[in-house]
Structure formats: C-alpha cells, structure tokens
C-alpha cells in the first residue's frame, strides 16, 4: 500500500507546474477562433440550403457541411478535454479548484457545446427545429466564450503577478 501511495504522489517539477498553467489559455484562444470559423461554415451551409441554381451548385462545391462537421467535432473534443486539463492543472498547482464565475461559465460552455453536438442526428434528418436550436445554442456559446476570454485574461494576469 505504501508503494502505491508513493507512486501517486510523484513530484512534478516546479517549471512544469508553472508553465502548464499557460496551456489552457493558449488552446482556448485558438478554440475561440476555431468556433468563429465553425460559425462561418455553418452559415455557409444555411446559405447553400437556401440558394438555387448556379449559386447553389457553387456553394455545394465548397463542402461546407463536411468542413463544419469536422471542425465542430475537433472543437467539441479539444474544448472538453482542455476544460478538464485546466481543472487538473489548477488542482495540481493549488491543491484546490477555485469555485468562481470562470469555472461555472466554462462548465456551462462545455455542457452547451455537448448539447449542441447531440442535435446532429436530428439535423441530418432535416429537422429545422434542431438546426435552429443548434444555431441558437452556439451563438450563446460564442457569447459566453467571449466573456470567458475576458475573465481568462484576468486569471492569466493574476498568475503572472504571482510568478
């Protein structure tokens, strides 16, 4: 038992603990840009669905539906994993997770993006309610994401001030 406990309490080098705190914010800024790109792709899909004739043919050639699905899938996976990574790094560095608005809104963003992705089977069947709900949820996600960027910068500034 003592051997198992010593393995669980491996010492993490201080430099790793310090620099690991910056992984989450860097990834999140990339994901914010990715989310905006996913919105652009989604709007192009909607535009192609409503277009007619040559305009529709040109839009279909852009394969926006495939790109949107792929970008959305990567966004879902990386956003979810990165949220848990951030909590783990915070716990390793401070021995606790700070219960504040940044954590709560971050968990809401993860919950909303998972809910949005769960609408895919309904959207593939052409259900407009699912498409509209998907768009509405993701506009909300982008708004919360922007707010998270602001509070995240404040968190990073606090970390830097303590170095």
Model-derived segments and spans:
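Membrane-embedded alpha-helical bundles that constitute the cytochrome b-like, heme-associated redox core
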Residues: 2-163
